[in-house]
Amino acid sequence: MNRIVDDQITLIPYYRNDDISLLWYQDSEVCKQVDNTDQIYNLTKLHKMYDYLTSHGSCYYIQYEGVLVGDVTLQDNSELSIVISKQYQNLQIGRRCVSEMIQLAKEQKMVKVSAQ
C-alpha cells in the first residue's frame, strides 16, 4: 500500500524495477554515500540487496512529482536506510521520507530508529 508523504512525495512498496533502480546504484558517488565504497552495483548485487531488505523490513521506492528517485527502508531491527539519486538530492526529499518512516516505526511499535 502506498504511503503519501505530501503532495510531492509518495512511497511505493518495492517491486523489481531494475531499469531505474540500477542506475542509482551505478553512480559511484551515491554508492560512497550509501556503503562508503566506490564500488558500484551490478544486477546481482542489486537483487541481493533488495531481496534482503524486503525480507527484513518495509522497503519503498520514493516517487517525487511522479518520478522514482530513490528508495527508503525501515528494517525489522529498526534501522533506516535511504538512497536518493544525485540529481534529486538537496530538495529535502530525504528529510520528508525519514519523517514518514519514523511514523511507520511508531505504527509498528518500534521504540527507536537508527541510521548508519
Task: Give the ranges of each region predicted by the language model.
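Acetyl-CoA-dependent GNAT
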Residues: 36-87
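Conserved GNAT acetyl-CoA-binding A-motif
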Residues: 105-116
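Short aromatic/hydrophobic contact patches that present stacked aromatics
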Residues: 10, 79-83, 114-116
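Short, solvent-exposed beta-strand edge segments and adjacent coil->beta transition regions
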Residues: 6, 77-79, 110-112
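A short, well-structured alpha-helix characteristic of acyl/acetyltransferase catalytic modules
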Residues: 1-51
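Residue-level preference for hydrophobic side chains embedded in well-ordered alpha helices
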Residues: 21-22, 80, 97
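Conserved acetyl-CoA-binding loop-helix of GNAT-fold acetyltransferases
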Residues: 90-105
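Short, well-ordered coil/turn elements that cap or connect secondary structure elements
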Residues: 6, 54-55, 107-108
